[in-house]
Amino acid sequence: MARKKAALDFEQSLADLQALVERLENGELSLEDSLTAFEQGVRLTRDCQSALTQAEQKVQVLLERDGELTEEPFDDAELPE
């Protein structure tokens, strides 16, 4: 269930980001509203990037397990430096 929620959160964040971009591109927002939308867009972009990074790291963990696909919870402490 957590995976579905994370995927939905990513999908919703991406959809929200696309909607913000469309509103900004239309040029109908005031300067203040444009700045607010831009700030929201930056937050959404960071959220999406974080979700993509975690997914990429999980794929790497799955592929690096002696040729066997095993799934483990992602932990920042396991990241190679």
UniProtKB/Swiss-Prot annotation:
Q: Where are the transmembrane segments?
A: none
Q: Which GO terms describe its cellular component?
A: cytosol; exodeoxyribonuclease VII complex
Task: Cite a single Pfam family from the UniProt record.
Answer: Exonuc_VII_S
GO molecular function, a single term: exodeoxyribonuclease VII activity
Gene3D superfamilies noted in UniProt: Exonuclease VII, small subunit
One Gene Ontology BP term is:
DNA catabolic process
What Enzyme Commission number(s) appear in the record? Answer: 3.1.11.6
**Substrates-to-products reaction catalysed:** Exonucleolytic cleavage in either 5'- to 3'- or 3'- to 5'-direction to yield nucleoside 5'-phosphates
Family of this protein = Belongs to the XseB family.
> Which proteins does it associate with, and in what oligomeric form?
Heterooligomer composed of large and small subunits.
Listed NCBIfam families: PRK00977.1-4, xseB
- Protein name in UniProt: Exodeoxyribonuclease 7 small subunit
Q: Where does this protein come from, organism-wise? A: Pseudomonas syringae pv. tomato (strain ATCC BAA-871 / DC3000)
